[in-house]
Amino acid sequence: MDRSRIAILIPAFREAATIGAVVKAAREYADVIVVDDASPDETGAEAANAGAIVIRNETNLGYDGTLNRAFEEALSRGFAFAITMDADGEHNPALVNAFKVLLIEEAVPLVLGVRPRKQRFAEIVMGLYVRLRFGVKDILCGMKGYDMKLALANGGFDHTNSIGTELAINSLRRGTPFRQIPVSGTQRQDAPRFDRRLRANMRLLVA
């Protein structure tokens, strides 16, 4: 399987303690692009030392803005597929192989991860809409796989600060075929570095 066709995209903010190990593990399966969201620590340096392609935001752009830059970088480098992952180790990099098989060998354009943990109330509310309309179990899981043609059709990854869901939901609305696979990893114990405010998703709930 040609690894030059696929990139792992990781947005990172103040993740110096974990990003190096995440990148090293992920690079076993694909090239890694890390976008450092103007972190005040050594996040970018740790990612670069581990072998990632690193770009840095001069100002803090947040989760969606940072992933926008990651998708732009991947497209500019000619990658045909992308897998998004978190920088904190919540997603097991070994799962990349399962995503690659679906994206490349089985030509599934959209692959959605499903977390095993219990979801918060607001996540359940958001998830209920997406589950009922599209049959998606966990739209807020940060590990997703995309054919880059979906990003081109959407004009990028995000325009609405959607907590990482706009591209997936808009693709689903277009009737894009998808598959779901369980994802595992280590759930972080402290607060998420990116402020993923769930109320932002309400912009996507209008049919």
Model-identified regions with their sequence ranges:
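Cell-envelope/extracellular polymer assembly enzymes that use nucleotide-activated donors
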Residues: R5-A7, E166
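Short, well-formed alpha-helical segments that are part of the catalytic scaffolds
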Residues: L9-E28
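Acidic helix N-cap motif at the loop->helix transition within catalytic regions
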Residues: A17-A21, D41-A50, A94
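A conserved acidic beta->alpha catalytic loop
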Residues: D36-A45, G89
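Conserved donor NDP-sugar-binding/catalytic core segment of glycosyltransferases
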Residues: N97-R120
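Conserved catalytic loops of nucleotide-sugar-dependent glycosyltransferases that act on lipid-linked
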Residues: T66-L67, F71, K118-A207
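Conserved donor nucleotide-binding strand/loop of the catalytic core
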Residues: G44-R77
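Short beta-strand-to-loop acidic/aromatic patch adjacent to the donor-nucleotide binding site
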Residues: F79-E90
